[in-house]
Amino acid sequence: MYLTQDLELFHEYTVTQLLFKDVKNATELRKMAVNGEIKGALINPSMVVDAFQILVATNKAVHLHKIGKMKTRSLYSEIIFNLSPTNNISEAFKRFGISDSDTAVHIVLVHNKEETLNIDDIISKVDGQQIDVGQVSEMTDTAKIKKLYKITPQEDKCGTLLDAVVCRMAIKDVA
């Protein structure tokens, strides 16, 4: 149901992803995240192509956190920011964070391997149905993603949508 992976470059960290649909308490979840009651990134799954996209954003966020170069105030807000193709923080939150009207949420947790993670505590806070993280692509709004990341038809023919999105995320700081 959830996906847990170690970060290759930061062996001491593990990333856990959870996906929920039919969520009825998005407003409360967002408030809990803002207040620090949920230590995780709450992401709108319609803007996610694949769990790998989240892993890339998380890896970059952990890297920037470790070297003290984050552009946002927390590791979890940095994950949301890293999903965006632009450097506008508020725009990233609007597009990739959850809103009060959302009925699905993708939760990303980053934890030290030595820490015990109480996933059941997080799950109990969500009034919705947990589904397998692999199903995130079924929630993807492909048209919205192509427009936001400015993916051309030519690019679409020679590679996957995930490739194009991850490339845009990777070069955001370079371009």
From Swiss-Prot:
Belongs to the CGI121/TPRKB family. NCBIfam families: PRK14886.1-1 (NF011465). InterPro entries: CGI121/TPRKB, CGI121/TPRKB_sf. It comes from Danio rerio (Zebrafish). Component of the EKC/KEOPS complex. Component of the EKC/KEOPS complex that is required for the formation of a threonylcarbamoyl group on adenosine at position 37 (t(6)A37) in tRNAs that read codons beginning with adenine. The complex is probably involved in the transfer of the threonylcarbamoyl moiety of threonylcarbamoyl-AMP (TC-AMP) to the N6 group of A37. Tprkb acts as an allosteric effector that regulates the t(6)A activity of the complex. It comes from the Eukaryota. This is EKC/KEOPS complex subunit TPRKB. GO terms for biological process: tRNA threonylcarbamoyladenosine modification. The lineage of its organism: Eukaryota, Metazoa, Chordata, Craniata, Vertebrata. GO terms for cellular component: cytoplasm; cytosol; EKC/KEOPS complex; nucleus. Disruption phenotype: Embryos display primary microcephaly, leading to early lethality. Marked apoptosis is observed in the brain (telencephalon). Fishes do not show a renal phenotype, possibly as a result of early lethality. It is found in: Cytoplasm, Cytosol; Nucleus. Keywords: Cytoplasm, Nucleus, tRNA processing. It holds the Pfam family CGI-121.
